[in-house]
């Protein structure tokens, strides 16, 4: 499906891969080149856009603390938020290697996914189906993910790092191709 739209150069034929198309507010998890999970996402606002980048997810952090970037502290006076209902990361985040403090995560504001225009974050990607993504990434069941959440703050390394591409395609296939 995606290969017919010229996106195939970015998608590996084997293994797991995550593609986030910034302007369509969508994430697709692929296994062996085939979509296995689609999710609405929230991306960066016009003043703090989500950058295009290539990275890898190496762990899932459960009940993470939110720590603002140095720029957020300086410009907005923001302070760290411990795990809990006020934490904008929600119950889990996907740790990624990059220098821009960008990662995928859950959210404590689920109602925002109902909006058609979802450029609302500081640049990170909020994933509506974060628990399903965690289950897929960890080769775990939804019940196992819930059990990991119930154990408090901790990180679980992935069995294998998952490549992630944050891209900006103005033409992008939907579920019907």
Range-by-range predicted roles:
Residues 1-177:
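N-terminal pre-domains immediately preceding structured catalytic cores
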């Amino acid at each position: 499906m995606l290969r017919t739209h010229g996106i195939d150069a970015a998608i590996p034929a084997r293994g797991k891969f995550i593609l986030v198309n910034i302007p369509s507010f969508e994430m697709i998890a692929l296994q062996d080149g085939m979509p296995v999970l689609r999710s609405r996402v929230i991306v960066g606002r016009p003043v703090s856009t989500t950058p295009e980048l290539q990275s890898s997810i190496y762990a899932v952090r459960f009940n993470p603390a939110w720590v603002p970037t140095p720029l957020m502290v300086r410009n907005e006076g923001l302070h760290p938020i411990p795990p809990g209902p006020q934490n904008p990361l929600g119950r889990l985040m996907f740790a990624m290697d990059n220098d821009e403090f960008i990662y995928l995560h859950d959210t404590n504001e689920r109602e925002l996914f109902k909006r058609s225009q979802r450029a609302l974050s500081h640049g990170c990607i909020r994933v509506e189906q974060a628990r399903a993504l965690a289950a897929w990434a960890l080769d775990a069941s939804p019940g196992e993910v819930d059990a990991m959440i119930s154990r408090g703050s901790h990180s679980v390394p992935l069995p294998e790092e998952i490549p992630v591409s944050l891209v900006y395609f103005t033409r992008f296939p939907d579920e019907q191709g």
